[in-house]
Regions:
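Nucleotide donor/acceptor-binding cores
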Residues: 48-49, 110
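A short glycine-rich, Lys/Arg-flanked "PGG" loop and its adjoining helix->strand segment in the class I
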Residues: 128-140
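Conserved class I S-adenosyl-L-methionine
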Residues: 1-47, 60-64, 143-174, 205
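Class I SAM-dependent methyltransferase SAM/SAH-binding core
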Residues: 52, 57-104
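Conserved Class I S-adenosyl-L-methionine
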Residues: 58, 177, 182-241
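A short acidic, Gly/Pro-enriched loop at the edge of an enzyme's catalytic core
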Residues: 103-114
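A short SAM/SAH-binding and catalytic strip from SAM-dependent methyltransferases
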Residues: 113-127
């Protein structure tokens, strides 16, 4: 058994690190009909199991897992968000939150049945150190579940591709295919209480030009947003090379 505590380089999140209160509004709007949770449950049910949420932010998703998991551990590299996550979950007995990055999880070998990451770190090529760490902390048969935005699903995916120079959703999908993941595409709706909240969220998600175009192309208080759920299980037996 060993724990990884070595410091690693962490890229700042362009939204939740700078605007945590507004990102909380975004979190509440996302997946308004629960499609991601249903797909995740179908692919890797966590009832009675030990769950790790990598890049847990302010802990928004931790209580959902904790409702029927044996234990839930949130790992987050940004100290202010670690404190927010601890405050959010202080009264939930089976949740723990640690400071750390995906490349060096502060956890022991074989301590988890499910490692979950939602729009955090695992964005395609370059995340291999995190994949290795997830395998290290997973027990045999455990699952790594990565929820990421689907850059091929309009309208949000089109805005994403226009905003992030060099982003290629086909190449991202090829990467996860080659790494042995299965993929489920999920159609969701972000539903905001106020139009002003929708516009403010788009302005923290995209650079000004793309944000204003996205606002102009969106009527009302809802945005269709596609996701991809990538799942890979750790082998249970001896691997012959």
């Amino acid at each position: 058994m060993r724990a990884r505590l070595t410091a690693v380089h962490v890229l700042p999140s362009p939204n939740i690190w700078q605007w945590p209160e507004l990102y909380a509004v975004e979190n509440r709007a996302q997946d308004s009909t629960g499609e991601i949770w249903r797909a995740l449950r179908a692919e890797c049910d966590w009832r009675g199991l030990d769950v790790v949420d990598v890049g847990c932010g302010d802990g928004f998703h931790l209580p959902v897992f904790a409702q029927d998991a044996a234990s839930v551990t949130g790992v987050e590299p940004h100290p202010p968000l670690v404190e927010r996550a601890k405050a959010r979950t202080r009264d939930v007995d089976n949740i723990r939150v640690h400071e750390g990055g995906a490349q060096r999880l502060p956890l022991s070998d074989g301590c988890a049945d499910l490692v979950h990451a939602r729009t955090a770190y695992f964005f395609g090529p370059g995340c291999e150190p995190g994949l290795t760490e997830a395998d290290r902390v997973l027990r045999p048969g455990g699952a790594l579940a990565i929820v990421d935005l689907d850059g091929a699903a309009p309208p949000y995916g089109r805005w994403l591709c226009d905003d992030v120079r060099g982003y290629d959703p086909v190449a991202v999908q090829r990467f996860f295919d080659e790494q042995g993941f299965s993929t489920v595409r999920i159609a969701t709706v972000w539903r905001f209480e106020r139009r002003a909240d929708l516009e403010a969220v788009l302005r923290i998600e995209f650079a000004a030009k793309v944000a204003e175009r996205a606002i102009a192309e969106t009527a009302g208080t809802e945005i269709p947003v596609g996701y991809r759920l990538h799942v890979r299980r750790k082998p249970t037996g001896i691997i012959l090379l």
